[in-house]
Amino acid sequence: MAASSYVDGERDMEKGGMILLQSSENQNPMIDPSPTPSPSATATAPALVLSNSGKRMDQAGKKKYVKQVTGRHNDTELHLAAQRGDLAAVQQILKDINSQMEGILSGEEFDAEVAEIRASIVNEVNELGETALFTAADKGHLDVVKELLKYSSRESIAKKNRSGYDPLHIAAIQGHHAIVEVLLDHDATLSQTFGPSNATPLVSAAMRGHTEVVNQLLSKAGNLLEISRSNNKNALHLAARQGHVEVIKALLSKDPQLARRIDKKGQTALHMAVKGQSSEVVKLLLDADPAIVMQPDKSCNTALHVATRKKRAEIVELLLSLPDTNANTLTRDHKTALDIAEGLPLSEESSYIKECLARSGALRANELNQPRDELRSTVTQIKNDVHIQLEQTKRTNKNVHNISKELRKLHREGINNATNSVTVVAVLFATVAFAAIFTVPGGDNNDGSAVVVGRASFKIFFIFNALALFTSLAVVVVQITLVRGETKAEKRVVEVINKLMWLASMCTSVAFLASSYIVVGRKNEWAAELVTVVGGVIMAGVLGTMTYYVVKSKRTRSMRKKVKSARRSGSNSWHHSDFSNSEVDPIFAI
């Protein structure tokens, strides 16, 4: 019963099994389908290769597909036919789908089902993740590729195998330019694929010297020149390393500036070329851009250093013949090309390289007169000295700033002490002046008026005592209402208050002298006159002396300001100190 269910399903097991398409009416539901055909099965219907998933798929109870595979990597019959390049076998496998579906479905349902089965067969992958199209592109079977493209989906064409390559990329690697052309004509965006290490098809083809493939890719996607591998090596780097002359010509004709591009090590294509054996490649690169002959990499190696280290005698001779070549440039290790050559094992190539270098005037590093290095050392020393000076200046400015803060603090404390002292003195003046009006000289009458109210001395006493009182009170009011904090502003207020205190002192003195005439009486006026002379001389002397020094101090400050202004206008490198910033700040009062 089980054997009869696999109609014409048996094939040679060494070639592998196949998928059987059959009607569900002829299948015993109690028998588990197996991918291994029964030896007793009779062949009446062709087989279809559909899937290597190993699963049974039942659709609407009408049909069943059973997977059978063969080959090293679970290849289907379609894979094997594509690998052989057997176009007839490929066409037969795809054609058998129609014959097997006849009688089961019809009309649009038939066409849709056939298309679905055909797509499943064509897009099937083996254990390596390769479709039949990939296999045909890898082996270079153009006709098979064209046939499979008719039934391949966009995802299948761009599908990568486990190594990271798609059909276009593998065709470029193998140099199958006709297949590359067919695939690009089918879908030009396939050229934008990336393989391992971010390699494009152009990079892979250039590295292997497939000139026709390179030309095909450049004609369809010129932007591939701008895309490098993950190490920043582009197609020109890799082609130059392998010495592919025609590929170099094709790439440079597309973009001559490509010769200047560097990889992560700072190497140009010339650095890569001198590692190889082709002098012609070196000539092509130098013709495209002669300046790159002295372009160093990140280790300061020029092409001459690299060629010497690789013992490329012919290339060394070519480089030394160029007028731009300097045979005495130093690497980061402070070595010239001659130092490198002398460090090579003794051989015919190393001896010839040393001869070429000697003829070109090459010297050892310790023999060089190195003014540039000395200049660099001097400049470095100057930079260090300037840096030290700047640091010292910075520290000095910081110290000056701190000293300035301390001076402002001391100055503010001095002003506060002065204002406090002035306040105390002003209060004393006001107290004396206020008390004097109630204890007038000569006593009072019964009605409270002064006994000597009619005398001129009493009137002088009364007026100047009042002036002393109100002046002192004004000073007290200013002192208790002033908002402190601005040194210069407080200083100006103190100057004004000092003048008021002078006035209060003078008024108090006059009031005292006037009251002395009242107290001593007319018989002893000589005593009052003596007190007047003594007091007047003392007060006049003190006030006159203070006035002189105040005026002199103001003149001195004015001269200093002029000198500072002249210095500031002559040099823009100095700025106003924080201490002077408070000079223009206003006075704020409650």
UniProtKB/Swiss-Prot annotation:
The keyword Acyltransferase does not apply. The chain crosses the membrane at residues 422-442, 460-480, 500-520, 531-551. Induction: By salt and drought stresses. It is a multi-pass membrane protein. Expressed in roots, shoots, leaf vasculature and stems. Residues 25-44 are annotated as: Disordered. It holds the Pfam family PGG. The keyword Nucleotide-binding does not apply. ANK repeats lie at residues 73-102, 128-157, 163-192, 197-226, 231-260, 265-294, 299-329. SUPFAM superfamilies: Ankyrin repeat. It is found in: Cell membrane. One of its GO terms (biological process) is response to salt stress. Keywords: ANK repeat, Cell membrane, Membrane, Repeat, Stress response, Transmembrane, Transmembrane helix. Its main location: membrane. Disruption phenotype: No visible phenotype under normal growth conditions, but mutant seedlings show increased salt-stress tolerance. GO terms for cellular component: nucleus; plasma membrane. Involved in salt stress tolerance. May act through abscisic acid (ABA) signaling pathways and promote reactive oxygen species (ROS) production. Interacts with REM19/RTV1. This is Ankyrin repeat-containing protein ITN1. It comes from Arabidopsis thaliana.
